[in-house]
Amino acid sequence: MQLFPLCLIISCSCPTVQASKLCLGWLWGMDIDPYKEFGASVELLSFLPSDFFPSIRDLLDTASALYREALESPEHCSPHHTALRQAILCWGELMNLATWVGSNLEDPASRELVVSYVNVNMGLKIRQLLWFHISCLTFGRETVLEYLVSFGVWIRTPPAYRPPNAPILSTLPETTVVRRRGRSPRRRTPSPRRRRSQSPRRRRSQSRESQC
């Protein structure tokens, strides 16, 4: 099993510093949180159960359907697009590693153990990353952060004192208790009544008085 960390370091040589740090952080226990720069944290994501996140195949299909042109573009679109590129590349290299291990390890038990570790543990991290950045691009980062906070409060509240259903991301802006900071929409106030101009009859009487 000592071969696995070495292979992971080699396979995770993604073309960006952030992706390399991310892979090394998983191995050597560095305090590197890939969500910090986006206002979230690994701990905040951990409130969501593992079965909450779609499969990697579904997430990759979603990313391809919605953002393929931007992901393949040589231009910098947003930090979320960059993070998505890194996560997709890293998962591809992990799959190459799992294939290599499956072909070269003679011990079936060790081979199954390594492949299972990649699919379960590393797979969950990639699923979390993909879900977070796809959701931020789809719903907006502030909405996703509000959802994570709302879900964390809901899951930690005893069942007797919380709503029966967990918050839903797509309906969060309409129902969340955590309000986004910003100016409240202006209310339209009725404009003051304009003073009526003097009627022609009144103006005529005044003109007659001035002539007298």
UniProtKB/Swiss-Prot annotation:
Location in the cell: Secreted; Host nucleus
Region (HBEAG): 25-27
Sequence repeats: 184-190, 191-198, 199-206
Biased composition annotated in UniProt, kind: Basic residues: 178-205
UniProt PTM comment: Phosphorylated.
Signal peptide: 1-19
Family: Belongs to the orthohepadnavirus precore antigen family.
Protein name, as recorded: External core antigen
Organism: Hepatitis B virus genotype C subtype ayr (isolate Human/Japan/Okamoto/-)
Taxonomic placement: Viruses, Riboviria, Pararnavirae, Artverviricota, Revtraviricetes
